[in-house]
Amino acid sequence: MARVKRGVVAHRRHKKILARTKGYYGARSRVYRVAFQAVIKAGQYAYRDRRQKKRQFRALWIARINAGARQNGLSYSRMIDGLKKAQVIIDRRVLADIAMHDAVAFAALAEKAKGALAA
């Protein structure tokens, strides 16, 4: 049986890891052992942050809706409650976009919410 030298395989594997650390600072982009740890950690951060991204965007939408609602004399929770009672089916992402870019339409929604709360 012939002797298998693993130089080619190891070199290819190292090259793959070092390619993923391109742009990293110092040894993290040059030394395989450090680069491998950096790639593992980057993967952990990416996994965690894909989940955090959803929470952060929801928090941003709520902050924007709250700001728009307060300009129209409502709090965020009263605005959402009023819209639910008025049977306005609109998600927070779209509502936040309306609050940012179309104040007139948002004011109309706020009035609808106020009407539903009063009734």
UniProtKB/Swiss-Prot annotation:
Family: Belongs to the bacterial ribosomal protein bL20 family.
Cellular component annotations (GO), alphabetically ordered: ribonucleoprotein complex; ribosome
PROSITE patterns the record matches: RIBOSOMAL_L20
GO terms of biological process kind: ribosomal large subunit assembly; translation
The UniProt record lists the keyword rRNA-binding: yes
Gene3D superfamilies, alphabetized: 6.10.160.10, Ribosomal protein L20
Reported function: Binds directly to 23S ribosomal RNA and is necessary for the in vitro assembly process of the 50S ribosomal subunit. It is not involved in the protein synthesizing functions of that subunit.
Keywords: Ribonucleoprotein, Ribosomal protein, RNA-binding, rRNA-binding
Lineage: Bacteria, Pseudomonadati, Pseudomonadota, Gammaproteobacteria, Moraxellales
InterPro entries per record: Ribosomal_bL20 (IPR005813), RIBOSOMAL_L20_CS (IPR049946), Ribosomal_protein_bL20_C (IPR035566)
HAMAP family for this protein: Ribosomal_bL20
Protein name per UniProt: Large ribosomal subunit protein bL20
Keyword 4Fe-4S: no
GO molecular function: rRNA binding; structural constituent of ribosome
Taxonomic superkingdom: Bacteria
